[in-house]
């Protein structure tokens, strides 16, 4: 029996942006933007160092400054442009963006508990409020 050639595989590396001012303060960010802190820039540099020996064909980033800045630091030694897309933004938290994360958690604790009881399919489509994206909506933007 003749062996078929292996299909070409694509390896996808997902990298989170470095720490931002809002991360540091515990503020819900979502699709609002906040600049990287000095620690966030250092995190991006460390990530770049860890990835330095890996060949990339392309680098994608959301259009938010924090993600673009992180991607730009990672690509410094590479001859690649960073391709940005609004579709790669984080989940939108609607009216909760800019508010304290601890208040968000406290306000929705009963819903966090409810999600744990749902099937995987139900959990993916569950919405905390009409203006907060479900997992399904976030994934739908990426694909």
Regions found by a protein language model. Name each.
Residues 15, 19-78, 84:
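Active-site-proximal alpha-helix that buttresses catalytic centers in soluble enzyme cores
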Residues 43, 141-142:
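Hydrophobic alpha-helical membrane-association signature
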Residues 78-141:
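Phosphate-handling substructures
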Residues 1-5:
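Basic/polar N-terminal segments that are highly enriched at the extreme N-terminus
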């Amino acid at each position: 029996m003749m062996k078929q050639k292996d299909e070409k595989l694509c390896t996808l590396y997902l990298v989170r942006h470095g720490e931002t001012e809002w991360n540091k303060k515990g503020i819900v960010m979502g699709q609002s933007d906040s600049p990287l802190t000095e620690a966030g820039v250092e995190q991006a540099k460390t990530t770049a160092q860890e990835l330095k020996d890996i060949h990339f064909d392309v680098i994608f980033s959301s259009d938010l400054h924090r993600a673009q800045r992180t991607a730009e630091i990672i690509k410094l030694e590479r001859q690649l442009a960073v391709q940005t897309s609004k579709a790669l933004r984080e989940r939108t938290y609607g009216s909760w963006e800019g508010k304290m994360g601890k208040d968000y958690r406290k306000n929705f604790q009963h819903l966090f508990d409810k999600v744990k009881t749902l099937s995987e399919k139900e959990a993916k489509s569950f919405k905390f409020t009409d203006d907060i994206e479900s997992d399904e909506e976030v994934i739908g933007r990426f694909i």
